[in-house]
Regions:
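Pocket-flanking alpha-helical
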Residues: 1-9, 25-26, 31, 114-117
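Short helices/loops that flank or line small-molecule/ion binding pockets
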Residues: 6-7, 56-57, 77-113
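A conserved helix-loop-strand patch within extracytoplasmic ligand-binding domains
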Residues: 11-64, 168
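Short beta-strand->loop
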Residues: 11-18, 89, 109, 114-135
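A bilobed periplasmic-binding-protein/Venus flytrap-type ligand-binding module shared by bacterial periplasmic
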Residues: 22-33, 138-154
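Short amphipathic alpha-helical coupling segments at ligand-binding clamshell hinges
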Residues: 38-40, 150-161, 170
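A local structural motif
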Residues: 38-39, 63-90
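Periplasmic-binding protein-like
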Residues: 52-59, 160-183
């Protein structure tokens, strides 16, 4: 969102957290990370946010290391250690699922994975480890409004209705149980 605001000059403000949707790595060629071989090619989303998330997942799993000064959004050029000499191919996020026949693995956003029959909890080789207790991640989904309107009564009602036990139950069942409510109820 911050990138969109910067690029287009939108005057938006987050009004509430909604849910977390972990990105996952999927493959038709491997089932576990330890099956990766030297020189394998991994597809990551081409947008900076999701590409960075993908690299951070591999870093958390001990596959690569990135320059810590890049924070939450490292790029391929920020990889400081890559013992398997993995090749990273950037593809439009909506198209990453189409690459599974051609590459060792692909990082696929949760919504695209689910739309194509994948269940993150069952099918991902590895996935982002997100917690509803840590909302400092820049990858939490938010509802936004125009900055000048964020305090309007209608939005207070929307937030109250959305951040409810019923909504949390629906989210926990969505996408095969992959979504994580990002609010307390």
């Amino acid at each position: 969102m911050n990138q969109e605001i910067k690029e287009h000059g939108y005057k938006l403000a987050p009004i509430c957290y909604t849910y977390l949707d972990p990105i996952g790595m999927y493959s038709k060629k491997i089932k576990r990370l330890d099956e990766l071989k030297k020189g394998d090619s991994i597809v990551i989303p081409s947008d900076p946010s999701n590409g960075g998330r993908s690299l951070l997942v591999l870093e958390a799993e001990g596959v690569i290391k990135t320059n810590v000064s890049k924070g939450q959004i490292p790029d391929v050029g920020d990889i400081t250690e890559n013992k398997l000499e993995l090749n990273f191919v950037k593809i439009n996020p909506a198209d990453t699922v189409k690459t599974l026949d051609d590459y060792t693995a692909a990082f696929i956003n949760g919504n695209y994975a689910f739309e194509n029959g994948f269940i993150a909890n069952r099918d991902a080789v590895c996935r982002e480890k997100l917690s509803p207790d840590d909302l400092s991640t820049p990858f939490v989904k938010v509802l936004v409004a125009r900055a000048k309107d964020q305090g309007r009564a209608v939005f207070i009602k929307v937030i109250s209705a959305y951040q409810s036990k019923g909504s949390a139950q629906v989210l926990k069942q969505a996408e095969g149980g992959a979504l994580i409510p990002a609010f307390t109820y």
